[in-house]
Amino acid sequence: MKERLEAFLKGAIAGLQGPMRMEPIAGGQSNPTFFVDFDNRSLVLRKQPEANLLPSAHAVDREFRVMQALAATDVPVPKMLLFHADRDVVGTPFYMMERLQGRVFPHYALPGMAAAKRLEIYLAMAATMARLHKVDWAAIGLSDFGRHGGYFSRQIARWTKQWQTARTRESADVERLIAWLPKNLPDEAETSISHGDFRLGNLMFHPTEPRVVGVLDWELSTLGHPLADVAFNCIAHHTLPAEYGGIRGLDLAALGIPAEDDYLKHYYAKSGRTDGVSAFHFAFALFRMAVIFEGIAVRAASGNAAAGNAAEVGALSSAFAKRGVEFVND
């Protein structure tokens, strides 16, 4: 594969010099990602996995398209270089982008950082999310990137189907959420670009400044509802450190991390919103994550997961479903 890829890239991207070096990027659960370096240029390759067990997943073409469109906005994204749909080079469709230089923080608690710096990181995250949701998606050619309105109804149906397709067990908590969510739908008329996985670990920050230089991992992006992103972005406030690195139960004031209400107020101020997230939005976000974790467990069982801890992460499905039920009022 490496030899084919090197020959392809040198033919498709002008000026690449020296032998190609390729290194897998650890930590991802979905689309395999690699650093691809030449003597004079550092790139990133992102591809579909060899197998695709879940419908509509691993859409690298959509990732490429939305980031290419956002290049014309104030939302920071890597520069897209090419998309290759055929399987003749690396076995599955893939795209190439410029490699950004900066810091990625996988843990919401931001260990080893001064309290004042933690606050700056959180406020930058909220401001970046607000910029995304204010983008005129029609003006940048994304009118057909998803349906307009009715986002939560469609998403509940989608993730319910994913659960029924992928589940390896029964879950009373998931079934309770499947029953409750459609009966408690909020207004669905609003439409924005929805990242679908807007969390701290999918942001790259400037090497020294509290500034986002790249929003990464757009696999789940679509035209959706901004409050879906907002609720998902706040999941860490509702989950324990052992539950995928949540911050529930930590002394947030001592850490310099804003309480959820303060964090949301900052987002609302930057986005110009007058309404906010509700119990429904949090329950939906946790339900969706429970189904995603179950899908990771399925891929782990088949040996087709990008990260080595996929079996462990898949076990979190039960924990997130339980947290989702905490928002259910029958």
Q: Could you tell me what each predicted segment is?
A:
Residues 146-147, 273-285:
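All-alpha amphipathic helical-bundle segments outside canonical DNA-binding/catalytic cores
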Residues 19-193, 207-209:
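ATP-binding pocket architecture of kinase catalytic cores
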Residues 1-16:
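Juxta-kinase regulatory segment immediately upstream of eukaryotic protein kinase catalytic domains
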Residues 228-271, 285-303:
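Active-site activation/catalytic loop segments of kinase-like enzymes and analogous catalytic loops
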Residues 273-277, 291-330:
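Helical subdomain adjoining the active site within ATP-dependent kinase catalytic cores
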Residues 203-205:
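Hydrophobic residue at the +6 position relative to the catalytic HRD Asp in the kinase catalytic loop
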Residues 216-221:
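Activation of the activation-loop gatekeeper triad in protein kinase-fold domains
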Residues 193-195, 200:
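Catalytic-loop of the protein kinase fold
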